[in-house]
């Protein structure tokens, strides 16, 4: 009998949500996602120390500006970790643009192009890279421009249907609805602490996005993310992709049994609607208090971890 991780692979592409090379070797995912929090955790792994030292040395050769050294070393480290991961997987690595740039279209595009250039210098083609951007209006517009340059994007911190719709209309390659954080909010802000699968707001959110995309013929990939437990994951079997932490990959691999495909579209295609304007996007997004709170919170958390990472680098630059 297959374990549930093997069974799940029948319906969804499995992506590892980690920067830990040993975990990637163990679970053999198709793709891998990283973010500032995961890169920060990776700096605590002894096997990465040579990459950190190399990034610092490289940054010092690029300019005489100490502040720029910090930025360059942080970018270089994220890319070098990505390069090591790509040696172990057949697919793509997602590397994130600094969350502090989430509301700056031009700066986000520049940072993305810098990351792609660093990968190119390491002989990694852009087809193996997804640039991660927060799904703000500005992040979506930056992704739209990057996609036209052949740079594929992963729009993250996605909580509202307005975000999902705007991403599809911009032609982005992939979105990452944050499943677990949706439930966190509802548990905190309602009297209901446990939800049946048919009433679960996290499951309903991804189901709505998935079926909307398929119904209107959008090619944007839906990748469920930020899971809290294996039950959440199994409720979305059939989602295009699922990015899963090593701990939950381990749990799935230890569970024996079959998996039922929960997401499948069999309806007729419908015409795409007129794209949202900026004002329509903000109006619709702001009707969802969970999405407003969680998007802002997520950007702050990633920005905080990015600063912690820069501080780690600064100590080595001193």
Curated annotation (Swiss-Prot):
Q: Name the EC number(s).
A: 2.2.1.2
Q: Which reaction does it catalyse?
A: D-sedoheptulose 7-phosphate + D-glyceraldehyde 3-phosphate = D-erythrose 4-phosphate + beta-D-fructose 6-phosphate
State if Cell division is listed as a keyword.
Answer: no
Query: GO annotations under biological process?
Result: carbohydrate metabolic process; pentose-phosphate shunt
Enzyme category, top tier: transferase
The domain of life for this entry's organism is Bacteria
Q: Which residues form the active site?
A: 132 (schiff-base intermediate with substrate)
* Gene Ontology MF, one: transaldolase activity
Q: Where in the cell is it found?
A: Cytoplasm
Record GO cellular component, one term: cytosol
Pathway(s) per entry = Carbohydrate degradation; pentose phosphate pathway; D-glyceraldehyde 3-phosphate and beta-D-fructose 6-phosphate from D-ribose 5-phosphate and D-xylulose 5-phosphate (non-oxidative stage): step 2/3
Gene3D superfamilies noted in UniProt:
Aldolase class I (3.20.20.70)
> Transferase: present as a keyword of the record?
yes
The entry's keywords: Cytoplasm, Pentose shunt, Schiff base, Transferase
Q: Main location per UniProt?
A: cytoplasm
Q: Which family does it belong to?
A: Belongs to the transaldolase family. Type 1 subfamily.
Assembly and binders: Homodimer.
Primary role: Transaldolase is important for the balance of metabolites in the pentose-phosphate pathway.
What name has this protein been given in UniProt? Answer: Transaldolase
Q: Which organism is it from?
A: Hamiltonella defensa subsp. Acyrthosiphon pisum (strain 5AT)
Starting at the broadest rank, the lineage of the source organism is:
Bacteria, Pseudomonadati, Pseudomonadota, Gammaproteobacteria, Enterobacterales
Q: Which gene encodes it?
A: tal
